Amino acid sequence: VLALLGLVLWAGPALAQRKRSDAIDRSRKGHIKGITVENLSNYNQRFFRPGIYIAPSFSRFFIEQSDAYISAIQQGRGIAANSIISPGLAIGFIGDIRLGNVNTPFHLRFAPGLRFETRSIEFTGRGVGMPDTIRTQEVATTQLELPLLLKYQSNRRRNTRVYMIGGIKPSFAVTQRQNNQAINQLTINRTDILLEYGVGLDLFYPYFKFGPELRFSHGLRNILDPRNNTYSNSLQSLRTNTVTLYLNIE
């Protein structure tokens, strides 16, 4: 809330003096059909554009089973793992820098933020004294994310513009919580790096720009923290896959 208030206070004086460009639609006979106001007409002239975002997400682990699991399954026993799609939420700030003159389609975006999520894996035991028993392992984390992204945007059409975005996102687990350590024995590494790409839409309003953006993230590192327990021994690697809807305000 304080960040949003600060953004409005920063933008207020400039927007009070902004110039708007009006587009007039006329019929073949010259009659006026309507007038379209171009909001924030001087927006491209800004070299640096700050903002904030809130982003609901859904994530799951991409799982590779271990050789020990394959050997156990061949002997009629073992534990099978299945990742569950889990919701999350991210909040943060936006720093957007223009790369070139006012007409360049390229922008560099740095968007540090925090992500809160609890990821889960279901383990099904077979032939180990608890046939077909399902145990769920949960890993709750608060992550500091530092994405560095390249944005390629189309020409503006009145008050809308589409864009593509992609880059690299380092991620660091600030906290990692296990509600019941006797049950939740699975742990993951605290650092990760992800490949990100997506598409978005810029919508220009009189006092701000709103940009819904759909972004996909794929972890490049194996974040499994190997421990000597039944759950870790059945896994070879864990990688993060996430789909996030960013709601950007600049």
Task: Identify the residue ranges that each predicted region occupies.
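Residues on the lipid-exposed face of transmembrane beta-strands in outer-membrane beta-barrel proteins
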Residues: 37-41, 52-56, 89-97, 112-114, ...
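Predominantly the C-terminal beta-signal and adjacent terminal strand-loop region
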Residues: 190-192, 197-250
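Residues that define the transmembrane beta-barrel architecture of outer-membrane proteins
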Residues: 44-50, 85-89, 140-144, 160, ...
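Membrane-spanning beta-strand positions in outer-membrane beta-barrel proteins
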Residues: 49-51, 105-107, 149, 159-163, ...
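Flexible, solvent-exposed loop segments that connect beta-strands
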Residues: 64-82, 117-139, 175-188, 224-236
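Short loop/turn motifs that connect adjacent beta-strands in outer-membrane beta-barrel proteins
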Residues: 39-48, 100-106, 155-161, 204-208
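Short glycine/proline- and aromatic-enriched beta-strand/turn motifs that initiate or cap beta-hairpins
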Residues: 16-85, 250
